[in-house]
Each structure stands twice: as C-alpha cells, then as structure tokens.
C-alpha cells in the first residue's frame, strides 16, 4: 500500500506516469508497505500466464528474494526509477522516505534493489551510474543500508499512517533496530539469486 497522501500523475512522454506527493512527506516516513492485497506470483504461476498478461506483470511488478513477482494492487506499481531516489526499500517489507519529499515531487525508487531481470538505461540524471543492473544491490547495499540508518530517529518521530499495515513481526523487528536492541537487516537480503531454486515454487 502506497502512502495515502500521494496520487498518480502523468510525468512526461519518456517515463509516462509516476507517483507524486500531494502533501509534505518528511524523511523517515513509511511510504509503502507490502500488504495482503498485493499479489505474489511464483515462477510457476508466471509461466502459466498468457503472454500479454505476463508482459504486463513483468513491467509493473518487482521480484522478491524468493523469485516471486509482486504486483502492487494500487498506484505503487507506477513509482519510477531514480539513481538519486528519495525512497528506500528495507528488508522488512516496507519502504521509507530517506529525504523530505515535497508536494508535487515524485516518489522514486532505485530499481537496483528490485531484482530487475535485465539491465536497462533510464533517463540520464547526470549521475555517475548510467545503467541499472540486476545485481546492483550486491554492490551498493552498504550505502543503501546507511541511508536507512540515518533515518531511524525520524521513523519514530514523524506521523506514520501506514504503520498499522506493517506485519506485527516485521514492525517489532524494525522497532528493535530503532531502539538499538538489534542490528539492521541489510537490504542485501532482498536480493534474488537466480542460481538458487526455491522448492515449492
């Protein structure tokens, strides 16, 4: 579930639609939670889909660390990529804002932690990185983990409308991290190794 103070807007001809903040969203805010309405398709289920449906799923889903394609039920599926993203995935099935997001600003993810199937070249943002690779999370997880750590105090101090949708065990584990009682699980654990077979899938 995407943050309630967001909406879908047409951005431009290159990226199409995107998710934009309607109000100020401070850093540390949970901006997305994987909830029970999101659908996770196993590799076998994906193989059974008709080609047009499978192509839609490939475009609008992300891959979790089990190799499942997760299709968000709301406009979260339209969040665009940025090499300087203002949102960051965590290993606790939710994302947080790692910078303040202002009204009219897009919410963006770095697709490098979403287990994309093939490298792709997005719009040039003037950054050193120009290509998103399937294994980027293995290269940049230390940097990305630090961006989460920098917002642990903010997580506890800002309004959190999505908190009630986080699974109790995941929320408890993250709160343990915020209070210094546990180590942060690395976003590296979100990586799907295509060489591993998950039995039952």
Model-derived segments and spans:
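Conserved catalytic SET/PR domain of SAM-dependent protein methyltransferases, capturing the structural core
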Residues: 1-201
């Amino acid at each position: 579930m995407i943050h309630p103070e967001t909406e879908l807007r047409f951005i431009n001809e290159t990226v199409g639609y995107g998710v934009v903040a309607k109000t100020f969203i401070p850093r540390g805010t949970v901006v997305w939670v994987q909830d029970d309405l999101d659908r996770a398709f196993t590799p076998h289920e994906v193989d059974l889909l008709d080609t047009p449906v499978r192509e839609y799923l490939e475009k609008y889903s992300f891959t979790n660390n089990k190799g499942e394609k997760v299709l968000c039920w709301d406009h979260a599926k339209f969040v665009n990529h940025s090499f300087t993203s203002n949102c960051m995935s965590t290993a606790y099935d939710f994302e947080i804002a790692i910078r303040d997001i202002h009204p009219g600003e897009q919410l963006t993810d770095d697709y490098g932690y979403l287990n994309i199937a093939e490298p792709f070249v997005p719009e040039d943002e003037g950054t050193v990185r120009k290509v998103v690779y399937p294994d980027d999370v293995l290269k940049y997880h230390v940097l990305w983990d630090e961006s989460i750590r920098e917002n642990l105090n903010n997580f506890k101090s800002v309004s959190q409308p999505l908190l009630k949708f986080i699974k109790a065990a995941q929320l408890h584990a993250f709160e343990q991290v915020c209070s210094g009682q546990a180590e942060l699980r690395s976003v590296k654990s979100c990586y799907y190794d295509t060489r591993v077979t998950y039995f039952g899938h």
